[in-house]
Amino acid sequence: MSDDKLKPLREQIDALDAQLLILLNERAKVAQQVGHVKAETNAPVFRPEREAQVLARVAKNNPGPLHSTDLQSIFREVMSACRALENRVTVAFLGPVGTYSEQAVWQQFGQAVTELPCISIDEVFRSVEAGTAEFGVVPVENSTEGTINRTLDLLLQTTLTISGEVALPVHHSLMTRTGSMQGIKRICAHSQALAQCQSWLNEHYPTIERQAVASNGEAAKIATDDHSAAAIAGEMAAKRYGLSIVHAHIQDDPHNRTRFVVIGRLIPSACGKDQTSIVLSVPNKPGAVYELLAPLAKHGVSMTRFESRPARTGRWDYYFYVDIQGHANDPTVSKALAELQTQAAFFKVLGSYPHAS
């Protein structure tokens, strides 16, 4: 009886799938035409502001029952596949594969890209600066561990610009080759992951040795080769390295997130929900920082982040990294930045880009 009820529903799904197949290929054909026009004008293949607008429209017009984030993931992969018909972009990231950095690449670009895993954040910057990759994805801050200082230092020095950002929830899982903790003698992970799971590990596996390694991807590789080792990593690593998850979501902070920035030579246009990152320094005098930031309040520009870093001059000078709402070309933001520049001892716009939800 149940088969009699399921048969017409399955036939309906098959018919809808056939329509989807036709529509997806029609979309791809139009995307190819877009690619031809871009090639004539030497326009960039990847336009983060355009893709951000598409994803925002998907969420706004979604009638359900599918969740908007799930639909956005589907549309991101559709755009990625269509973009690859124009040109498959190369994206450098902090490797190896199976890390949260690779997951951030997929969240920004989809999976239809050429990946370039790098051994360090410095190498990611060098790869993009040399033209080996069009874009790079690097971590800039974690909600529990704080700022990635090396990324800030390199953003100050580079000629590249920030063209996007990714806010990635960090969900750590404990995984092994066998799917069991039987016979496990050590738990491997990046030092930050071990710190972020410390309370959980103390409660559940207080006597097992913990070993810090270069990355969670490296930990997963170790667990693949050594049956006596477990790894802490993301779900992607388990899939990449053929491991089984023993315990999921073991991080102490359920709201743990890492923010990544996309670096490249592309300067995105405004999409309507933008953020601008700047770095500046001030003369060493009383009230200098307060006076410097006054133009933001004057022009009604909201500051969302303020971070200081030593300037390494030996004179107790500091660089201030500031994120503000809006695009650098927005009239009010443009006026505020112009005033900031006249007052600052050093001033640099790191980039304007679509703000990640």
What are the residue ranges of the model-derived segments?
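Domain-level signature for soluble enzymes in the chorismate/prephenate branch of the shikimate pathway
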Residues: 1-357
